[in-house]
């Protein structure tokens, strides 16, 4: 009798506990939505990333020579190149204290990008991004002679290829090469587009970098205007438009310091 009674009380206690935490979660979500509406109305990305902007300015100054050399090598405008990844530099400094990728790296090496795909380094490049660039260059080898070193030899096993790719993405020099290859790919893939201004071109290339150049043209156009940065489309808090931040930097880089 007492055993049954005790079990009943225990079950009720657990049920009430679950209800309490469920209500707590619902309340938190409602509070977040309410706060988000206010935040979106009062925050600019300049104030939201105030501390990150200072760190990014120092990073760009420290690596100015390296970035200019790469831009000169591949005949790209340095400010245009930097603007594309400027939002990612902000994001990197925003989340770096929470980054732990060792487990994901092992999972990626063993199973591939479909199982584990995550952002790496200051430019926040994912393994799948590098893979797509390598595949595009290999498919159009005649037009991408200057980027042929990005192609990983097929003799290497898939695990070794992934390990090498991860090692590359942890180095700034390689990330810069992938970045310039990305711009060259956009020039090649979207050659039919006629941009009125360089800013319009940047807006498209930045949106494309944000969601992936392999996505459909209409999806990229849509992303030019969406406030899904820095936490993705499912996040309910303060968000900004990736392409707009890139353009703001390009128009007046000194104001971002």
Predicted regions and their residues:
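Bacterial Sec-dependent signal peptides at the C-terminal "C-region" and cleavage site
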Residues: 34-45
